[in-house]
Amino acid sequence: MAIVDDAEMRLTESEAVSSSDDRKIVADTPDFIDESSLVIRTTTGVRISALPAEQSLVDSDGSNSEVTLPAKDEVISDGFTCVNKEIVESDSFREQNLEIGEPDLDVENRKEAMIIDSIENSVVEIVSSASGDDCNVKVEVVEPELLVENLVVAKEEEEMIVDSIEDSVVEIVSTASGCDCNVKVEVVDPELCVDNLVVVKEEEMIADSIAESVVETVSRGLDYECVDVKVKEEPDLGTKLEEDSVFPNVLEKKDEVIKVLEDQPSEINKKLEQENDDLFSSGDSDGTSAKRRKMEMESYAPVGVESCILAPTPLRVVKPEKLDTPEVIDLESEKSYTHVKMEPVEEIKVEAVKMSSQVEDVKFSREQKSVYVKKEPVGARKVKVEDGDFPVEKDWYLVGRSLVTATSTSKGRKLEDNEIVNFTFSSVAKWKVPNIVRFSTKRCGEIGRLPMEWSNWAVSLLRSGKVKMLGRCVAAPPFLTMMQEIMLYVSFYIHSSIFTDVSKSTWRIGSSPNLESTLHPLLQLFKHLTIKPYQKAEFTPEELNSRKRSLNLEDDYDERAALLAIAKRRKGCQQSLEQNKDEEEAPESYMNRVVGAADSYNLEEMEAPSTLTCNLRPYQKQALYWMSESEKGIDVEKAAETLHPCWEAYRICDERAPSIYLNIFSGEATIQFPTATQMARGGILADAMGLGKTVMTIALILARPGRGNPENEDVLVADVNADKRNRKEIHMALTTVKAKGGTLIICPMALLSQWKDELETHSKPDTVSVLVYYGGDRTHDAKAIASHDVVLTTYGVLTSAYKQDMANSIFHRIDWYRIVLDEAHTIKSWKTQAAKATFELSSHCRWCLTGTPLQNKLEDLYSLLCFLHVEPWCNWAWWSKLIQKPYENGDPRGLKLIKAILRPLMLRRTKETRDKEGSLILELPPTDVQVIECEQSEAERDFYTALFKRSKVQFDQFVAQGKVLHNYANILELLLRLRQCCNHPFLVMSRADSQQYADLDSLARRFLDNNPDSVSQNAPSRAYIEEVIQDLRDGNSKECPICLESADDPVLTPCAHRMCRECLLTSWRSPSCGLCPICRTILKRTELISCPTDSIFRVDVVKNWKESSKVSELLKCLEKIKKSGSGEKSIVFSQWTSFLDLLEIPLRRRGFEFLRFDGKLAQKGREKVLKEFNETKQKTILLMSLKAGGVGLNLTAASSVFLMDPWWNPAVEEQAIMRIHRIGQKRTVFVRRFIVKDTVEERMQQVQARKQRMIAGALTDEEVRSARLEELKMLFR
């Protein structure tokens, strides 16, 4: 018998024999077990199959051999076995000196480079993981040294690499030899040598184990199990016969095949039989030794296979194919000492062997190592194992079963058929110790271990205690030796605790779990058990995280410029701000670059509802159409029967839970049906300020009125065993009954009256009922609130209610049809209570209205997506991994992905957006922006210079000590005083802690020509409270923690917390006492301290009034407007209410009629001020704080804007200007910014320009700190 190559296989049998130039012979494939092909798999993973051939032997010269083929079931030698006229390889000739290296790697079909790379990558992985650096390694496995050449690592990392490789070699050697070994690793440049591989008698086994490990690496690198590896036999296996050996080992290397015929005895057969008889007749005179040897040999191998000798020659896999499921096939004969394992496989050929009639040197091998053979195939035994599977346990669910080929790590032990095996693993994960799963039996102890491709993922599951493995032996050798294959049938069970109640899922909106914990290896279990989802998710994390995945987004110039700016900044190529003035951008263009502006001219237009009293512009009709379509979704019945797009459905073996649903992003599993009802409907209307977002929303409310449905938003699920018809009923029955509300609009307090007025103005009478839920007379009846079509409230009221009752607050007990967040950037920080309160609201549709969805950093958008319930992006782990971090690192995928997410969710138009005809969508009067540079008087300059020098000395000390950022608050305090000094020195002289600035008193007297009043000291017990009071006196009033607005009638608690008196008393259940909402301290009403309201200034500012340079320039502008007689109205913005106090003095003296609007005004006071300013002609000036007037207000009655002091964030100033330059404005808007020359204000403009060039969120924490330090140094130049 022989195996031929492809060319010969295409010939006929006779032609093949006649054309066999290299003296190859041909034999037939026998008929055996369904006439399937046979293959032999060695312990190294190499599989060899016989091919069809003639039934006659051909000698080396091409003539017919005198010896005919062996009959059926005849076995030839313990090296090769001929069964059914097929040549197979026995395990007794394991490759004991397998050389895997570039010279000895004989690979066909052009796969040599792949295999060499696979071997080298295996070693590179060990070296790289230990050193943390990349390395270039050339591997050659020889006996007895392991050479690793061209090791490119840093010298200081060498010791760690040596230890890692030494541990790896120790493990291989110890596993192969069964005993501990002492390995010495010597690093020689450029080679890494491993010496002293245990004792000499174990060298062959160790070399074989190392070689097998490399073969396993090669096998894993290909798509099929068999590999193109040349297997060389031991050059000389012959050793002297030891007296106590059962089998003499005098077999020498042969180049011939010796075949013995059972039916026709020959000289060869006679010689073989004589040799066998001599073997068993030798020993003591009484024959006991021979008898004992024969009994031991018979017990060593089961009866049924007859052995002969076949000397091996090199075998090579030439044409590997994808293999079928392994099957073990019986060999039946009367007697045998050799057993082989055979498996069906596609056509594979090996090199031919030669025939010889010489038998003088043919003898039995001492090291005969059998491979297991059973009388029934695996399929039959698998059925028996399934029938006798493990008993059902209450809380454990059977997922599936699989055949696993394990490896033995023990000698001389025996496994019974269907014997139960137990699995163990290390309870502590260590980077030096791989994940190993060992198996044992109660009878024999440890037997072996699972392959690493199973252990790597199984250990993490087993450690959780929620997954367990139970196994039985299917096929194993009768007596085990090292590194033999054992076939196990393993069952996998999962505990019921692994299932998540979807309504209580930890994958919450706005949650921030550890990303690694969300990547659950349960998916790996399904993969190895070949369990595929019968209902797949719409998209997977792999698709999102793949570098090959294309989002089909066009790269625009702005995006590339932004990424280039990041790269330059990371490389230290940042140029000075003065050299880059031409790169300065407006906040509007900055916003457009990051989030983009929609091509809205392709949108259809929708006519306004008849109940709307105003006319909509074309772009507003487009917005109405887009919002209406966004609110349309699948109906309730379909949603209750539709699987959520982030979940997949799998079928398992356990009848109690035939289906498991797995969240592919969080890894959570459930046996309940996750419905699609949570999917949000709505989006972000991000039109630039002044385009009429309020009117568009009112048109939507009138066009699509509705009431909430309890089942629409709650994350509830139906029983998995319910059919589709009952799923909706069960789903609704599980839902908590809530009142059905209309539209909830949440806005800042300053916009409450404006929303109410707009709703009443733009809708016909009795069309909608509006409730303003604000103030002390609020009702707590959910049904009464829900009865109104529109409910208006503030972020402060919502947050206060949420803090008290969390998800059971008055707003959370209503299922709203629609929720609208006006000025939605208010919740840009997703960790705040205000943001969390909005996340927990229940509604059918959700809308965010904001002209600045991105203010400071990319993370601002994340909070909006959390409110909209856009999965999986409402989870911080995935947002951070796939968007935030790539964006920070300059990876364009981060920016592309956020654009892809926002494209269907956001509609954004700017004042520069054009329609189909190329015209601007909104024609507004132009703006005239000027910067007025003020020159300080001599007294002001001296005062400022002294203050600056003192501040700079303190700042330089912080820099020298390296504690700048540790004293960041103190430095901001220094900058605050410098900025206030630019407005008016009185603001600095209002400080009560005069000791720090005592040396400035002489300069103050020069400016005021009067000494400041002294400040009395309070009792020490009230010192800390007085510090808090002083913040309020200085104009640095903090917002009330309950309503999130500037404190109105502020009070101090004994625990030194400041808030509105009304907000605090309203939060108490009793009128006389309650808890502090901050620290939960018990408070009494009599203990509350009213904050001082007397003048904050240390001097009598009215009596000692003197105009500063900035105030003088402002008065000149106002006088000019007054003299013109045009009736123009002006708004003066400042961020300090104390400066507004000072401005009142010269305005009164010069006869100007003015009003004031700041955070201290209550809601009714604000309504009165705005109404009077818009309707009366006498009040031409409005003093307004930048914070209170920067959002949402419609101030088109004014046409002149005065910005008295620069703000850190230019977007805040832009918002204030847009209150005037918007729809309804009919005059040119004049904007005047006041800057004092050669002061910190001038440098603040440069800092503003720097911030505008920085892409939000594009810096690491370290770079943020470095940027802050550079900005501070710029300000103190």
From Swiss-Prot:
Motif stretch (DEAH box): 822-825
Gene name per UniProt: RAD5B
Function: Possesses intrinsic ATP-dependent nucleosome-remodeling activity. This activity may be required for DNA repair. Does not seem to be required for DNA repair and regulation of homologous recombination (HR).
Protein name, UniProt field: DNA repair protein RAD5B
Enzyme Commission number(s) from the entry: 3.6.4.-
GO biological process, one term: DNA repair
Record-level Gene Ontology MF annotations: ATP binding; helicase activity; hydrolase activity, acting on acid anhydrides, in phosphorus-containing anhydrides; nucleic acid binding; zinc ion binding
Source species of the chain: Arabidopsis thaliana
Subcellular location: Nucleus
Lineage top rank: taxon: Eukaryota
Zinc finger map (RING-type): 1040-1080
GO CC terms, sorted: chloroplast envelope; nucleus
Residue ranges of the TM segments: none
Residues annotated as domain Helicase ATP-binding: 674-871
Region listing for Disordered, in residue ranges: 271-293
The keyword Phosphoprotein is annotated on this UniProt entry: no
